[in-house]
Regions:
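Intrinsically disordered, low-complexity mixed-charge segments
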Residues: 482-516
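A subset of signal/propeptide-processing and intrinsically disordered low-complexity segments
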Residues: 306, 517-520
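OB-fold/S1-family single-stranded nucleic acid-binding modules
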Residues: 100-106, 421, 460-496
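Hydrophobic/aromatic hotspots within intrinsically disordered, low-complexity regions
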Residues: 495, 504, 521-524, 528
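Short nucleic-acid-contacting surface segments enriched for D/E, G, S/T with interspersed K/R
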Residues: 398-405, 439-466
Length: 562
């Protein structure tokens, strides 16, 4: 069966599970069947060239720009119910402890028994005697088997020490004219988690196969936190009486253990945000260094070839291995590939070069170029999605000028505080000139503004009441003022200047450090990234970001993104 969101149209994966006996041990046979896109999209044909150029599907609130033509993504390749479809299967044996003891890959034709949604499956798992279960009695035992293997895999995940940040994904609901009607949080239930763990297991098997056969590929790697980020987070934790274990090289388990310790604290959200910001971004690379956040020694993307080009490359590599051959991408115009790297990657490259540990140009392969290209296009797609969402949110809130809302401080900078509004899930800036007549010091370690005269503090996750004062659609910015202060002008001449203009004109808060580095935005890859390798969230990034603001708490993830 396939299990996806209500609005999904391209079905990459289908799952099946049954209990099996291996010797005296009770185990599970987990089958993850993935659409065989590589059968239809051949190297260097027109479809392949276009797919490589895009590298990923781009998800917007009301539409999707697919990596592949819809006749493939929603038709021939999509694992629709009651029709035969070509797949590449990962057939694995999972122990009761959640360990994959054996696996094999093979091409197969499947006939999906049903197209299920997360909510339908969650209802069945929550009540096997309920109306949803009564509608599909033949499927219930199979779903319970999947639920059992999920619990086993989840047990192994906890023992492994994988990090599981609790983040909120939002969903933008638009009317027929494309205008936002409401923004609502997307609930992540047990059905999401079942699929996530199944996809993670298949992705790990794919990476292991590449390693065992010494076949090159694009691994999904996630480096451990940098020395600079560790210093920042340890300084912050020390000030609140906490410590991150692990010394100079903490493990994912050290992070997970600390998160477990602070879970019940009133400042748990702030602490999670600071830990999240110490992370690096996951990227694609032929050089496997493991996945820090998921605590895997090797990890690759295999489960979403309809919407991610690296998964298609992994499929081609696996098929070559099955045939006893080697797949080497050829005929690719290197000059046409995206070579943009993130700031963090650029810093690491400079550091490696200074230490003489960098990869020399003569040693770079086509796989290196493809890893950089796919990583860059993934970031580009994310930025495009956020930009559209930001504009829509600005358009949504421009009718609410002068209205008051409660919210939480989601970012602190030298020029003000960013506030995410409750219920609306929209973010705006309260410029430092709107915080009162006090002179504010910016504490980089604590991520707070502190008034020198009054001692008033504004820190991440503080609750405030604000008023919408201005919306700049072109700049995608929302200006707020603290409620109870000077009345905001909301119409006619004399509208307050935009926060962007104020940020340029006003003297920013004095930083307590010579250089206050803004934290890089990090999206744990899962969900999901945490979640698993997931379809791009169609909502969640708030509008109103200033160019040089500190990163705000992550508000993402959906199905299987990691």
């Amino acid at each position: 069966v396939t299990i996806d969101g209500e609005d999904a149209r391209d079905f990459d994966d289908a799952v099946y599970c049954e209990p099996v006996k291996i010797g005296k041990e009770d185990c599970f046979r987990l089958i993850v069947a993935i659409a065989d896109v590589s059968h239809y999209v051949r190297p260097n044909d027109a479809l392949d060239v276009d797919a490589l150029e895009r590298s990923t599907s781009v998800y917007f609130p009301r539409r999707v720009i697919p990596m592949l033509p819809e006749k493939l993504s929603n038709g021939l390749c999509s694992l629709n119910p009651a029709v035969d479809r070509l797949t590449l299967v990962c057939d694995a044996v999972v122990s009761s402890k959640g360990e994959v003891s054996a696996y094999q890959f093979y091409p197969a034709v499947i006939h999906s028994a049903a197209r299920l949604t997360y909510n339908e499956v969650a209802d069945i798992l929550g009540n096997t005697a309920g109306p949803e279960a009564a509608r599909r009695p033949a499927i219930v035992p199979h779903l319970l088997n999947l639920y059992d293997v999920y619990h086993a895999l989840q047990k192994a995940r906890q023992l492994r020490g994988a990090i599981d940040f609790e983040t909120t994904e939002t969903y933008i609901v638009c009317n027929a004219l494309g205008k936002i009607e409401k923004i609502i949080p997307r609930t992540r239930n047990d059905a999401h988690k079942v699929i996530e763990e199944c996809m993670l297991a298949a992705n790990v098997c794919a990476a292991d196969l590449l390693i065992r056969h010494k076949h090159p590929g694009t691994y999904r790697i996630h480096a451990s936190p940098t020395e600079e980020k560790l210093t920042q987070v340890r300084t912050f934790l020390k000030q609140v009486g906490l410590n991150l274990a692990g010394g100079d090289k903490p493990s994912a388990g050290d992070y997970a253990e600390l998160m477990k310790q602070v879970k019940e604290r009133p400042d748990a959200a702030l602490l999670q945000t600071m830990l999240l910001r110490s992370m690096q971004q996951a990227v694609y690379s032929p050089d496997n260094i493991g996945h820090f956040g998921l605590a895997y020694e090797a990890y690759a993307h295999f489960t979403s070839p309809i919407r991610r080009y690296p998964d298609l490359l992994t499929h081609r590599a696996i098929k070559a291995i099955l045939l006893g051959k080697k797949y080497e991408p050829k005929g690719i115009d290197l000059a046409g590939l995206n070579t943009t790297v993130s700031n963090a990657t650029r810093k690491k490259q400079a550091k490696d070069k200074a230490q003489g540990t960098h990869k020399h140009e003569k040693d770079l392969t086509i796989w290196d170029a493809l890893g950089v290209h796919c990583s860059a296009n993934e970031r580009r797609a994310d930025e495009a999605s956020r930009d559209v969402e930001a504009w829509l949110k600005c358009y949504f809130i421009k009718d609410k000028l002068g209205e008051e809302f409660t919210g939480v401080v989601s970012g602190v900078t030298t020029f003000g505080i960013f506030v995410q509004l409750d219920a609306l899930y929209v973010e705006g800036l309260v410029h430092i000139t709107e915080l009162g007549t006090d002179f504010f010091q910016y504490d980089d370690a604590r991520h707070e503004l502190r008034g020198e005269r009054t001692g008033k503090r504004y820190q991440l996750t503080d609750r405030v009441t604000v008023q919408v004062s201005r919306v700049d659609l072109e700049a995608r910015k929302i200006d707020l003022v603290l409620a109870g202060g000077a009345a905001a002008q909301v119409s006619g001449a004399g509208l307050p200047k935009s926060s962007a203009a104020k940020a340029l004109e006003a003297k920013p808060a004095k930083s307590r450090k010579p250089s206050a580095n803004t934290a890089s935005r990090y999206e744990l890859d899962t969900n999901v990234d945490g979640g698993a390798p997931a379809k791009r969230s169609k909502g969640g990034s708030a509008a109103g970001k200033a160019p040089s603001r500190s990163a705000k708490p992550a508000t993402k993830t959906s199905k299987k993104k990691r």
